[in-house]
From Swiss-Prot:
CDD domains registered for this protein in UniProt: ATP-synt_F1_alpha_C, ATP-synt_F1_alpha_N, F1-ATPase_alpha_CD
Location (main, coarse): membrane
Name this protein carries in UniProt: ATP synthase subunit alpha
Alphabetized GO MF terms: ADP binding; ATP binding; proton-transporting ATP synthase activity, rotational mechanism
Subcellular location: Cell membrane
Subunit structure: F-type ATPases have 2 components, CF(1) - the catalytic core - and CF(0) - the membrane proton channel. CF(1) has five subunits: alpha(3), beta(3), gamma(1), delta(1), epsilon(1). CF(0) has three main subunits: a(1), b(2) and c(9-12). The alpha and beta chains form an alternating ring which encloses part of the gamma chain. CF(1) is attached to CF(0) by a central stalk formed by the gamma and epsilon chains, while a peripheral stalk is formed by the delta and b chains.
Pfam families on file: ATP-synt_ab, ATP-synt_ab_C, ATP-synt_ab_N
InterPro entries with a match to the protein in the record: ATP_synth_asu-like_sf (IPR023366), ATP_synth_asu_C (IPR000793), ATP_synth_asu_C_sf (IPR038376), ATP_synth_F1_a_nt-bd_dom (IPR033732), ATP_synth_F1_asu (IPR005294), ATPase_a/bsu_AS (IPR020003), ATPase_F1/V1/A1_a/bsu_N (IPR004100), ATPase_F1/V1/A1_a/bsu_N_sf (IPR036121)
Binding site for ATP: 169-176
E.C. code: 7.1.2.2
Family: Belongs to the ATPase alpha/beta chains family.
Function, in words: Produces ATP from ADP in the presence of a proton gradient across the membrane. The alpha chain is a regulatory subunit.
Length: 503
């Protein structure tokens, strides 16, 4: 062989050695049927449950039914361009979402894609949407309050960090308002809030985002939105996405709050998906695993023990009832999963008692362990007293002339407490001020005030305390206890305010 020929051979050998094309294997199938947001695919025999699939044009889908000779997938986008015979690739990734601090202040869809036009999100990491809930050993008892800023709730139905408290009521009774007030009240605090909008109108979600921005709440809030015009599969995934975002903060030792608005629409979306996937229907055409749908979501809310960082994820699911029927299928399911419920009554709402919390049906199973000692001291008997007042008020409709003096006094005080517990929307009250007004009410300082002037008394008291006795409010807020000295100063303040009051 000539020298030139040897040179060519050596060059070829060198190039062969340097050649290192990466070898990859992709599982590919083909669409055999498509329609109503569902695609049946042949050939993806190794597909996993909840695996992301890629359709032509970059449209994603999720494998939900793994059958003997095909896979049924829900399409997470527009399906009009997908046709029979199209190639489908398995991505090998389980459905996931970007998580981390970069999400705060953003509006995203359930796959973490931004919807607010503020550019791409700086992702710190990703998390799977579905995850097994923390077990009993990993948890810690709930003993730190989530201050909602709503007097009726903080005093009588306290919510703790790591609790799951259901907000339930008919349409237009103020369910979303309670959740938004709670988010707004966390301004300047350490609680990261996630608001999940499921099947809402895009205009309503835009209004909520604008409202949160107006009150400075988007600085600690993430909005996950799957609108009514979006694919039903996105509505099904939305709460799990919100939960995954919250879990990231919980596992970093921080506290997070997630609002699911609302799980009734989530159940409807799952029913629609299940029927399209030809799963056998059960009661009210819901699939048989409807309870598991919500239990596996809500069980992920927890307070972790100190070894795991002591973080927490609090859940506020919302359920819409029809004509006050709390015993319907979806409401009873969620009531049995959660640690209590706040029931909003249409009659109270229409009578101007807002928030329209029905104290008799509402309950917090965590109870006073999620209250500060100061609130516990002033509101200890309030729930029972209000329950008794409601019974007496119903009885007194037949006339009060024959009632004894103590019963009449109880009715009078009950009317004043009801007025004190009324509150305007988006006007959360700090915990120290709540303690002050409840102390005044339950110790008879409002007994001589006309019922119609109670709200004026309350707003005047707040201004008076801020101007002349700010140290009392500071002491209650810092110590979370009404010490003997603080109580003495508070009594002095209330006496002075009463003297200067023109009734």
């Amino acid at each position: 062989m000539s020298a030139r020929g040897q040179d060519i051979v050596s060059i070829i050998k060198e190039q062969i050695k340097e050649f290192g094309a990466p070898v990859s294997m992709t599982s590919v199938g083909s669409v055999i049927e498509v329609g109503d947001g569902i695609a049946r695919i042949h050939g993806l025999s190794n597909a996993k449950y909840n695996e992301l699939l890629e359709f032509p044009g970059g449209v994603l889908g999720i494998a939900l039914n793994l059958e003997e000779d095909s896979v049924a997938a829900v399409i997470l986008g527009e399906d009009s361009n997908i046709k029979e015979g199209d190639e489908v690739k398995a991505t090998g990734r389980i459905s996931e979402i970007t998580v981390g601090k970069g999400m705060i202040g953003r509006v995203v869809d359930p796959l973490g894609r931004p919807l607010d036009g503020k550019g791409p999100i700086k992702a710190e990491s990703t998390r799977p949407l579905e995850r097994i809930a923390p077990n009993v050993v990993d948890r810690k008892s709930v003993n730190t309050p989530v201050q909602t800023g709503i007097k009726a709730i903080d005093a009588m139905i306290p919510i703790g960090r790591g609790q799951r408290e259901l907000i339930i009521g008919d349409r237009s009774t103020g369910k979303t308002a309670i959740a938004l007030d709670t988010i707004i009240n966390q301004k300047g605090g350490d609680l990261v809030c996630i608001y999940v909008a499921i099947g809402q109108k895009a205009s309503k979600v835009a209004r909520i985002v604008a409202l949160l921005e107006q009150y400075g709440a988007m600085e600690h809030t993430i909005v996950v939105a799957a609108n009514s015009s979006d694919a039903v599969a996105l509505q099904y995934l939305a709460p799990y996405a919100g939960c995954a975002i919250g879990e990231e903060f919980m596992e970093q030792g921080k506290d997070a709050l997630v609002v699911y608005d609302d799980l009734t629409k989530h159940a409807w979306a799952y029913r629609q998906l299940s029927l399209l996937l030809r799963r056998p229907p059960g009661r009210e055409a819901y699939p048989g695993d409807l309870f598991y749908l919500h239990s596996r979501l809500l069980e992920r809310a927890a307070r972790l023990n100190d070894k795991l960082g002591g973080g927490s994820l609090t859940a506020l699911p919302i359920i819409e009832t029809q004509a006050g029927d709390v015993s319907a299928y979806v409401p009873t399911n969620v009531i049995s999963i959660t640690d209590g419920q706040i029931y909003l009554e249409p009659d109270m709402f229409n009578a101007g008692i807002r928030p329209a919390v029905n104290v008799g049906i509402s309950v917090s199973r965590v109870g006073s362990s999620a209250q500060t000692k100061a609130m516990k001291k002033v509101a200890g008997k309030l729930k029972m007293d209000m329950g008794q007042y409601r019974e007496l008020a119903a009885f007194a409709q037949f006339g009060t002339s024959e009632l004894d003096k103590s019963t009449r006094m109880q009715l009078e005080r009950g009317q004043r407490v009801t007025e004190v517990l009324k509150q305007g929307q988006y006007q959360p009250v700090p915990a120290a001020k709540q303690v002050a007004i409840l102390y005044a009410t339950l110790n008879g300082y409002l007994d001589n005030i006309e019922v119609g002037k109670v709200r004026d008394y309350e707003s005047g008291l707040y201004r008076f305390l801020e101007a002349n006795f700010a140290s009392v409010l500071t002491a209650i807020a810092k110590e979370n206890v009404i010490s003997a000295d603080t109580e003495k100063t508070l009594k002095t303040a209330l006496d002075e305010y009463k003297k200067g009051l023109v009734v």
